[in-house]
């Protein structure tokens, strides 16, 4: 009886996989257009990634530099934010306290925080600008429409001034002082290759969570890990933790070549990194689940489809990896 049920479940999974693959193929434009290529759209197109704001005396938007410019600070902290007016103040306060302490201990340490407001409908932008008025290290990159977390991270990292770029979630689920551990690993990796990625990982916490998982959650978890493997990611146990450190050299290839704009962009970055033979490592981090951070079932379905797109389009060579400095220079002259 159990064997029959297992066979039925296997057939169902296979059907879901086939239909999802067909849907992904049919619903996607099969081209090598990346997120940054959209900056070449007309200025009236709301998807255009050219909405950069920072406090200034004349209160006019300021154009950010690009990842292809020389670094101006040691580290950039990119914070994607969508409707985060309530949670982001505590996260920014904690981050500023940590970074200012680092700077007091080492005068050569410099930083910036780029908050990417991804088309928020609340007062996220106003809250961030209030912080920026008293903390010039904070800058706001504002997108007029919601494009997704992946697009927000790509926009922020594409215009970072740091030698090292940390992606960190606005909910503060991962303590900011974990940056020190990722930084240590990054410096080790760069002795081999300047293009490097360090992934914050919650995999060591899985044992604590498994006891509370329902059979459905266990099934979904196993299915997701299978799709991660199919997408081409190997050797990384936790691809989805919102705490990742990138070298500037790696970022010049990662974000200009990114296609996935919503939740499942992380595996694509790792696939791009593997294609470039970057140094990639995983470091355990302290992580606490924050209220309001649960993912919807519809988002999980979309993630599965995006993973199939990554596997198919990168696997077939439709999505390529190349240096796109000319695109940046043309756009920003």
Curated annotation (Swiss-Prot):
<dbReference type="GO" id="GO:0005789">
    <property type="term" value="C:endoplasmic reticulum membrane"/>
</dbReference>
<keyword id="KW-0472">Membrane</keyword>
<protein>
    <recommendedName>
        <fullName>Dolichyl-phosphate beta-glucosyltransferase ALG5B</fullName>
        <ecNumber>2.4.1.117</ecNumber>
    </recommendedName>
</protein>
<keyword id="KW-1133">Transmembrane helix</keyword>
<dbReference type="Pfam" id="PF00535">
    <property type="entry name" value="Glycos_transf_2"/>
</dbReference>
<keyword id="KW-0808">Transferase</keyword>
<dbReference type="InterPro" id="IPR001173">
    <property type="entry name" value="Glyco_trans_2-like"/>
</dbReference>
<feature type="topological domain" description="Cytoplasmic">
    <location>
        <begin position="26"/>
        <end position="333"/>
    </location>
</feature>
<keyword id="KW-0812">Transmembrane</keyword>
<keyword id="KW-0328">Glycosyltransferase</keyword>
<keyword id="KW-0735">Signal-anchor</keyword>
<comment type="function">
    <text>Dolichyl-phosphate beta-glucosyltransferase involved in the glycosylation of glycoproteins through the synthesis of dolichyl beta-D-glucosyl phosphate which serves as a sugar donor for transfer of three glucose residues to the Man-9-GlcNAc-2-PP-dolichol precursor to N-glycans.</text>
</comment>
<comment type="pathway">
    <text>Protein modification; protein glycosylation.</text>
</comment>
<dbReference type="GO" id="GO:0004581">
    <property type="term" value="F:dolichyl-phosphate beta-glucosyltransferase activity"/>
</dbReference>
<dbReference type="InterPro" id="IPR035518">
    <property type="entry name" value="DPG_synthase"/>
</dbReference>
<feature type="transmembrane region" description="Helical">
    <location>
        <begin position="5"/>
        <end position="25"/>
    </location>
</feature>
<feature type="topological domain" description="Lumenal">
    <location>
        <begin position="1"/>
        <end position="4"/>
    </location>
</feature>
<dbReference type="InterPro" id="IPR029044">
    <property type="entry name" value="Nucleotide-diphossugar_trans"/>
</dbReference>
<keyword id="KW-0256">Endoplasmic reticulum</keyword>
<dbReference type="GO" id="GO:0006487">
    <property type="term" value="P:protein N-linked glycosylation"/>
</dbReference>
<comment type="similarity">
    <text>Belongs to the glycosyltransferase 2 family.</text>
</comment>
